[in-house]
């Protein structure tokens, strides 16, 4: 039995199936970790959601920014963007079931060996603290009044964490750190505009602020950073939807598996 962490799929269903064949995935023995952004930009978001949801407990999925965007679109709180490609999900006969399955996913996951999050973790948070904060968001997403949370989720303010934050501001900072952040200051002030691997003045990649802290982290979200196999923090977003590759890391021995992707979008997005 093995566990494979897989980078941002973003609707690239054919490439996902090729990757699983590449390492001989067994539904009876193996587990899959997905770093988020199952949907959008690629052509087959519906197939991806149906396949991954059907894996049951064999698949652990953390929510990414595109997954949350799908939820807000479905509930009518976000206008369609020109490059959105999940109409197949919105128009599907099983859309409600898939959306409910998606919003029941965590935004952070950890076991005794590894931690997984889509974007990053702020330097002030220990793994245990971050898991507790993630649980606050997960409870809001799963509550009967979850639509109110989705309605108030978006925004880039506040830019930094404080234990005194409450209400929508508190939940928004947690969501932004775990699904949108790339750079922050040592004090935890986040920056959301830059997407390249080069930090803006005064900022550093979030993972550089966590050197020597706790168990290793696997994450995605950062195609312009690309594949980064560091024992402390590994980025598995190798830009499949942009013409790069789809990557999987076997967590037991850190063996890497990749398949080439044809690319559905011009490089440079998120």
Residue spans for each PLM region:
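N-terminal active-site segment of His-dependent metallophosphoesterases
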Residues: 1-55, 68
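Active-site-proximal beta-strand elements of phosphoester/diester hydrolases
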Residues: 2-10, 114-120, 235-236
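Residue-level marker for buried hydrophobic side chains located in beta-strands
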Residues: 5, 34, 61-62, 115, ...
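Divalent metal-coordination and catalytic microenvironments
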Residues: 8, 37, 52, 64-65, ...
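Active-site environment of divalent metal-dependent phosphoester hydrolases
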Residues: 12-14, 40-43, 66-72, 109, ...
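A short, conserved beta-to-alpha structural element at the edge of catalytic cores
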Residues: 30, 35, 39, 57-74, ...
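Active-site neighborhood of divalent metal-dependent phosphoester bond hydrolases
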Residues: 46-49, 54-169
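Acidic, His/Gly-rich catalytic cores of divalent-metal-dependent hydrolytic chemistry
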Residues: 131-270
